[in-house]
Amino acid sequence: MIDRKDTNRFKLVSKYSPSGDQPQAIETLVDNIEGGEKAQILKGATGTGKTYTMSQVIAQVNKPTLVIAHNKTLAGQLYGEFKEFFPDNAVEYFVSYYDYYQPEAYVPSSDTYIEKDSSVNDEIDKLRHSATSSLLERNDVIVVASVSCIYGLGSPKEYADSVVSLRPGQEISRDQLLNNLVDIQFERNDIDFQRGKFRVRGDVVEVFPASRDEHAFRIEFFGDEIDRIREIESLTGRVLGEVEHLAIFPATHFMTNDEHMEEAISKIQAEMENQVELFEKEGKLIEAQRIRQRTEYDIEMLREMGYTNGVENYSRHMDGRSEGEPPFTLLDFFPEDFLIMIDESHMTMGQIKGMYNGDRSRKEMLVNYGFRLPSALDNRPLRREEFESHVHQIVYVSATPGDYEMEQTDTVVEQIIRPTGLLDPEVEVRPSMGQMDDLLGEINLRTEKGERTFITTLTKRMAEDLTDYLKEMGVKVKYMHSDIKTLERTEIIRDLRLGVFDVLIGINLLREGIDVPEVSLVAILDADKEGFLRNERGLIQTIGRAARNSNGHVIMYADKITDSMQRAMDETARRRRLQMDYNEKHGIVPQTIKKEIRDLIAITKSNDSDKPEKVVDYSSLSKKERQAEIKALQQQMQEAAELLDFELAAQIRDVILELKAID
């Protein structure tokens, strides 16, 4: 077991100081946390600097913090912001590491078994390992996660107990170290040296930790004693410095020792026999044969390799858990006294609630037809009440908190005043009759000023028809539908900001997480059609898209004013009055937010100049030139990966592989 350093403190670095409502919000949140309050809500209007307030709170209470967002894009944005605020602390990123994921499933109607198929993003896997190792080594850690953090991850105790701890002067033979590395799922590869692998050259062992991407460690032996440990550049072997202590964390999160493995295997065998007997009694001979064949193969792999594909389905036995007991998750890697912050909580808490049921219905089918043992049902996400049991202290962050959050606490801390002095937009209702011509006129007014427009519709058909109509009228417009991938979506936002087009139309894509200061008009069609997209919270979120421009204006097209519309307009007007009073008192003139476009697209740079320049004929380069080219590209790849631009990083990697192949 390793000792966690608990003396580190968070150090917030920012050229800004709290302003507007921020000082009061920060003070209240910190006082409540230090006073032991379990739950509170930060109700912050769009553009009031909620992330900065969160950072100030984290720095002042000085607790390890888990920040949960409801999708990878928002998690990536938050990760980048927290990295800037806390450059000297451990800011980690923990999301699903699948680029592509087809879960294992069975469709009885067509007798179709769909095998699990996935593509793992190596960079995100590295970041996940970095998160868990940081949590066990230090206390000044912020982990920004998606709801993947409530999925099973393996026992933190087994993970920590499996750490290989090395120091200069330690008595351990080279071969014993190699055995220890294999036990924690490292692979020996003397040629292709990358994460999770080690290589051996005489009395020198080089290890590439699973949580690193360009630095490895060289362990030099003198007999059966470690002579010294050095940190090196994995590519060039250049020595970066001496190391007094090296903790090598397992290459997988699903760890168990030999004794526990044998216990687990005996339990798996017993469960298999019970399931076979049950199937045979029910006359399900095919299912009985199937579960025996599949399980015996997995047991053989576990005995020989300590691992098998789908090992997570046996995690209940390997962790020593009882039936129905919740799995270990990222939350178990945190110390007991940690802080949780839920970003856009009105969305995120709904996701946390829904994960369990969807997972269980799919797995029950696999169990009923002999593809998995019943214990596979315990490889699952947490139920919401199980998530709640992990909560020591929590802050829900949203402009529109949901009913669930409001039931958890009466402590609501408002943040309405923007540091920029910007007001919530004016909102007006216009009749739907003649809305197309009216909207066209409003768009043209904005376009003449170099401003942009968001339009939100209720149906795909309406969005497509409106897009076609505006194009015919000479408007530069795009429709962003739900099939568009995250990377493309961010590029569309970038093009809107650059003025490649002036109008963006969407359905449920113009609410949380899209902040474009150039947008001065938001048009809401069918505003009086009550429902998920036109309830009070949905309308307030959509109105907020115009709150980053000093000319922000919202038009609701409707034939009547619904209760949701009225409440959304009343709340917006209330905030606007408070903001105007504050500005008048302090002599503030609202200014449109000046936001560099590269900040919005940091995780997806799409400029052609950012692509690696591919040399047409690498064979014409000398070996020394090729090595220099590889080193330069490695640096570019590293920078792209740190910005979470995995598409660009993969392109650079392909160029590097092509260069290496020449040798």
UniProtKB/Swiss-Prot annotation:
Provenance organism: Streptococcus agalactiae serotype V (strain ATCC BAA-611 / 2603 V/R)
Domain Helicase C-terminal span(s) in chain numbering: 435-601
A Pfam family hit: UvrB_inter
Location of the UVR domain: 627-662
Domain Helicase ATP-binding positions: 31-418
Protein name listed in UniProt: UvrABC system protein B
Gene3D superfamilies tied to this protein: P-loop containing nucleotide triphosphate hydrolases, UVR domain
Domain comment (free text): The beta-hairpin motif is involved in DNA binding.
Keyword Cytoplasm: yes
